[in-house]
Every structure is written in C-alpha cells, then in structure tokens.
Amino acid sequence: MIELSPLIGTDIPTLTINSVDESRMKTMAALLRDPYPVHWDHEASKQLGIGNKVINQGPLNLSYIANMLIYWQGPTCIKRLKAKFLKPVFGGDTVIAGGKVLEVLDDTSSLVNCDIWLSRYQQTVVSGVAEIIITRK
C-alpha cells in the first residue's frame, strides 16, 4: 500500500501546450458533429465579434487536463473528473494544465481528491476537481 498522507499539498506536474492547434479543432468539430463555425472559420469568429481567432472545443481543453493526470499517475488513474469552463481558449494560445492534491479520500484504495485547472496566459480558463487513484509515488 502507498502511504498517501505526504501527498497532500503536492503539485501535479504541469502539462504545457505551446500552441493550441487549429487543425485539431476542425477535426474535433467534425468528430463531434459540432456545426458551430467558430471552431474552424475565422470569418465566423469575426462576424460574432470575437476577433480573428477560432475557439477551441471544451472536450479538447478537458483532454489537456486528463492527459496531465495520466502522465502523472497512469492511464487508469482517473476515477472522476468534474470541470467548469470559465473562459475560451483560442487557436495558437499557450495553455498549461495543472493541479494539486487536496485530500486523501480512502487510504485503502489509494484515492485522492485533486484541484485541477487549465490556464491561458496566467488566467484560469477551466477549473475543477478530480478523484485520482494513486499508482505511483
């Protein structure tokens, strides 16, 4: 069994996406059957008054957080993930996924509760909590 108490307050290693890829947004829009053109059409974004950048889909933003957790504790570590989308992420933005261990939920199953977030230029754009199964120390 892994001793979890020392983990409380531990920062989860961050994951940085140096430039959110617009071509992935277009692919994701097709996969999700998302007809909203602001995910791939710069002109549509201009017409809506949000500038010349396309907006990243929420599932892609959440995937950055999920990948950060998986890199930290492995592919089966995520038990529960709850997130709130606060601000948009645009094509070309740099984003950083991060988190911190808040509490031990169950010593016998190595389960911890974590604060998670995605930031864009030092502003939180996604925030939430995750229940993570600790498999690595």
Where are these regions (language model features)?
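HotDog/MaoC-like acyl-thioester-processing domains
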Residues: 1-16, 88-137
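Catalytic strand-loop segment that frames the active site of acyl-thioester-processing enzymes
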Residues: 1-54
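Intrinsically disordered, low-complexity segments enriched in polar/charged residues with Gly/Pro
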Residues: 4-6, 24, 32, 40, ...
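Solvent-exposed, flexible loop/coil residues
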Residues: 24, 35-36, 42-44, 59, ...
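A broadly tuned preference for mixed-charge, low-complexity surface segments
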Residues: 40-41, 52, 63-70, 115-119, ...
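Hydrophobic beta-strand-centered segment that forms part of the acyl-chain substrate-binding groove
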Residues: 47-101
